[in-house]
């Protein structure tokens, strides 16, 4: 399944229509203005339109759990690891609203960054996340939306840059809440590379997936963000590039940080391992690359989609 993070400007259903136009079979959206703590309630008419359109597109079925591959990304304001009680409470309240909105819209997956332990330490941050989820799942008992902890570049006090930390978070949340089916993972290829999980070659990509499977369980991966990286491996730089034009899949010009696309090079990169892996076939693969046109004047989403599909055969 392939999709992109698309705008809901005008109406949420516009993202579905744009996704269909671009040739995708899933999509990622914000369900509200992600830069604001408060949001208007979902309009009932818009909800009906959204649900009808997802059924019309058959985007409400398939995917890793048979519920389709539509994804929502939670607000970047949320920090469930914060030691600041006011920020933590606001984050829990906003995350609660995000879960409610996904449940109303029948969006199966809600991706969010775990948080940052500014002013404390990693053990404290992990405990705050566990406590947050205990409250979140208490407030949303019986909901079906799966919250996906996203791997990060691991810069500074940001949590999620190591597989062992992702695994520990999920294990603690699942044990505390007795809701293992509601907590899963999202990986981002750019974040992986920048965090130090080098994806420069196909063999390295296979090794990264094998390590993730061993530590976290590939069955718990529900969403994959597919982005090339403007930063080198272990750079801790969270900047996305078009597929085959960054430090993962492209022949990057020294010092310039700009890539020159080569299909031959792309086929030797970690992207080839990810796209051809049978365990990832039904997982929504979401582009979060810059929304610009390619040199031919066409949306770069089309170019990136075409490049990924060239790799989506076993053992390319």
Model-derived segments and their meaning:
Residues 1-72, 80-100, 311-316:
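N-terminal pre-domain/capping segments
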Residues 5-9, 32-34, 75-77, 115-117, ...:
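Active-site beta-loop-alpha junctions enriched in small/polar residues
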Residues 17-24, 43-71, 98-106, 135-143, ...:
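Acidic (Asp/Glu)-rich catalytic clusters
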Residues 19, 73, 91, 102, ...:
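Conserved, mostly hydrophobic/aromatic
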Residues 25-31, 68-72, 184-189, 218-230:
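Non-cysteine beta-strand/loop elements that form the S-adenosyl-L-methionine
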Residues 80-184:
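Active-site acidic/histidine proton-transfer and metal-coordination neighborhood
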Residues 159-163, 167, 193-282, 299:
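Gly/Pro-rich active-site loop or hairpin
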Residues 294-314:
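C-terminal helical cap(s) of enzyme catalytic domains, especially alpha/beta-barrels
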